[in-house]
Amino acid sequence: MSATGNKVFAPAIFFIAAREALEASLVIGILSGMLENLVVHTKSAEDLAAHDSLTESEKHEVEQKKRALVRKLRKIVLLGALTGLLIAFAIGAAFLAVFYTQVNDLYGKAEELWEGIFNLVAVLLITPMSLAILRAGNSKRKWKRKLENAFSHQNIQPNHRRDEEGEATVVNANHSDDSASASSSSARQAAEEEAGTKTTRTEKLNPLEAVDVVPSMSGDQRRKRGGLRGLFSKPSGAVNDLKLRMNRGTLALFTIPLITTLREGLEGVVFIGGVSLGLPATSIPLPAIVGLAVGLGIGFLIFRSGNLVSVRIFLVFSTCFLLLIASGMASRSVYYLQFYAYVQLVGDSAAESGDGPGSYNSQGYIWHFNCCNPEANKGGTGWGILNSLVGWNNTATYGSVFMYIGYWFAVAGYLWYQIWSEGRLALRFGGKTYWESNRSIQARQRKQEKAHQRQLREADQEEHGHSSNSDKQQHPSEAGPSTLSH
């Protein structure tokens, strides 16, 4: 039985894998939601006008094509995420294979020393990781803001190339852009008929015309195109215009989840590698796989239910559990370093002498039980689990106990400092505030000021909108229809 975890399931690895999977699933979920909004719910004024003139069957056909496009774009997102995950898995497997094949001999020569060092390294990795989990609830807003910035400049933009090219052949070049945009719909239809490029009503609302992910090229050029088009093309006889091409929009849909899952995967490899330094190799795969499944499942539930309350409960529970594990590791690290110094004095036989006299240093200990030994080959399984979870040991030294208490004081002090620095240190109960710090008062005032300024901007925009509409009614556009070339 290992001192830092049993031989099958290491709890620390489970929570680390779950946290990284949750972060990656949030990105994938946000991207999927953005695709739904960009393709299905976003309509221009022209699209809305044309939508009213469609029959029910035509509207249904348009919606079906939009849904098909969203499904194809989601395949690109999943492909990028899986690619990044596979790369991270390959790097992690190579790292663990090298460690467990090359370092075992060095580890066996000074087991107690390495146990103390590995536990200390694990504490330094788990503690910031567990505290970061408390902020995972804000990851949805953070990644939504990042992805909106990524798509803010012509990633998936309205595209009416064929309409514009059709008009370009019939609109006189001497007319300005203003007069061209002010041309009447009847003149536009006449121009399309003359050029032979008239579009149907459903084509105006075709999502593939409204989203810049469809190739605008000849049949020979489409056959020469490679990339992702072949991966997601439907067989002959299906909707041919659902073939995608790799432009800025589709490239972002592929690279953002790839980079995100690769980064989260490599981060998980670093943390899991550090925590597992003192663990047997058999205790790593199962908690890592289960943690990934739990993290992805929680990310899925966030976007299906929209309720973050249960997720916050899980995050707080995970943080408390990881801190409990880390506190036990901190205590064990001091104990193993002290025990290594004792072994150097009396010889290696002290480590194999069982629970009685000679198995521990008779000076500097607080308690010792001749039972309940987590290292015992027989009857120590239950105590070994407690050793993995809370750091139980049948021998307690002053150093190990003081380290355990000091660890919790340090964590509590850090959390109190963070609450104070963020302006959230206040005493509230039953909806009433009985006391709050000066920083909390300043933060509340800044928030109220921002809300007031936002209301003023919205009122100003609404007023400008009403004034512009009234101006249009009083002064209709004087631009006449576009002059057609003969």
Curated annotation (Swiss-Prot):
What topology in the membrane does the UniProt record assign?
Multi-pass membrane protein
A GO molecular function annotation here is:
ferrous iron transmembrane transporter activity
Deletion consequences: Strongly reduces virulence.
Does the keyword section mention Ligase? no
Query: One Pfam match, by short name?
Result: FTR1
Single GO cellular component term: plasma membrane
**Which cysteines link up through disulfide bonds?**
none
* Name this protein carries in UniProt: High-affinity iron permease fer2
Q: Which organism is it from?
A: Mycosarcoma maydis (Corn smut fungus)
